[in-house]
């Protein structure tokens, strides 16, 4: 009876069963196909740095002669372009092309680049500029060009004292980096650190600051006292750090531009581990006395202290 019933149902629903089996086959095929797409084996990334031409900044003979006496540099335009080139190279995202391959002079390229010449050397972007020295001020103009599209992407100018020529190079790099990548540049930044010198038995520690590329080192303390844990404020104009005052660890505040420093607060115990608040208006530090430690804040405007 069971066999007869089964055969009867199969005959009656044969067309439906075939349709049902088709759905099952399609479903199984879909699962197999999806699984095949998911199985991806990534072994490494592939990043091709952007070929970019950094043309030496042009400079007229009068400006160059005056700057040679002031800065003791043979050609300040070339020096600034070297800073830009080195910054782009170290970022890993750009491939500065050799100047030996350039087909156009810097002064002409800044006014009107021959894009076909730059395309021949495989450049996709071009930086040009010029330097003017007038009234004891350094004026630096630069332009960023899209070689493939044959158009200008950016044009800016900066005026500063001649000794800031390296920083101008960092600022130019920041602008170019942001325009081409969409991310903020980090080249016009400085590093605060503790410099050590002297024999092993008598090390001298000084608070020091330098550009992110290791140049323009400046010592902020004389090395008479131990210094530790320096930290910038958000504007990078002030530094807080740990040193000693009357043989006790104290938190100090230092203005980088003026060199003025002061002890933060008058506490009976010792203060250490200073940090600036995110808005830079307060200093957060640890205060220890009689074996107990607490965290305090000091408002830098009214000097109000809170635990």
Per-region residue spans from a language model:
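A flexible loop/linker signature enriched in serine peptidases of the S9 family
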Residues: 184, 196-206, 222-224, 242-251, ...
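Amphipathic beta-strand/beta-sheet edge segments enriched in Tyr/Trp
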Residues: 38-39, 109-175
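Short beta-strand->alpha-helix linker/helix-N-cap micro-motif
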Residues: 43-114, 127
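Residue-level detector of Asp-centered blade-edge/turn motifs that repeat once per structural unit
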Residues: 185-187, 234-235, 278-279
């Amino acid at each position: 009876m069971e066999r007869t019933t089964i055969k009867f149902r199969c005959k009656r629903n044969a067309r439906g069963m075939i349709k049902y089996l088709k759905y099952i086959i399609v479903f199984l095929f879909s699962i197999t196909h999806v699984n095949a797409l998911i199985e991806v084996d990534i072994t490494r990334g592939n990043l091709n740095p952007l070929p970019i031409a950094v043309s030496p900044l042009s400079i007229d003979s009068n400006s160059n002669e005056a700057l040679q006496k002031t800065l003791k540099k043979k050609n300040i335009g070339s020096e600034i372009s070297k800073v830009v080139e080195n910054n782009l190279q170290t970022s890993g995202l750009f491939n500065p092309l050799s100047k030996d391959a350039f087909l156009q002079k810097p002064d002409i390229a800044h006014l009107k680049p021959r894009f076909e010449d730059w395309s021949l050397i495989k450049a996709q972007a071009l930086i040009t500029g010029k330097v003017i020295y007038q009234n004891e001020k350094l004026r630096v103009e630069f332009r960023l060009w899209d070689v493939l599209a044959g158009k200008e992407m950016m044009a800016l100018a900066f005026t500063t004292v001649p000794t800031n020529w390296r920083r101008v190079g960092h600022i130019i790099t920041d602008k170019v980096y942001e325009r081409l990548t969409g991310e903020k540049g980090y080249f016009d930044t400085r590093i605060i650190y503790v410099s050590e010198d002297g024999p092993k038995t008598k090390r001298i520690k000084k608070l020091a600051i330098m550009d992110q590329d290791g140049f323009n080192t400046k010592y902020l303390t004389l090395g008479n006292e131990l210094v530790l844990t320096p930290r910038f404020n958000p504007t990078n104009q002030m530094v807080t750090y740990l040193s000693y005052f009357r043989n006790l660890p104290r938190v100090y505040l230092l203005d980088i531009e003026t060199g003025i420093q002061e002890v933060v607060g008058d506490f009976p115990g010792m203060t250490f581990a200073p940090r600036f608040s995110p808005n830079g208006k307060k200093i957060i530090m640890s205060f220890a006395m009689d074996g107990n430690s607490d965290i305090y804040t000091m408002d830098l405007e009214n000097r109000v202290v809170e635990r």
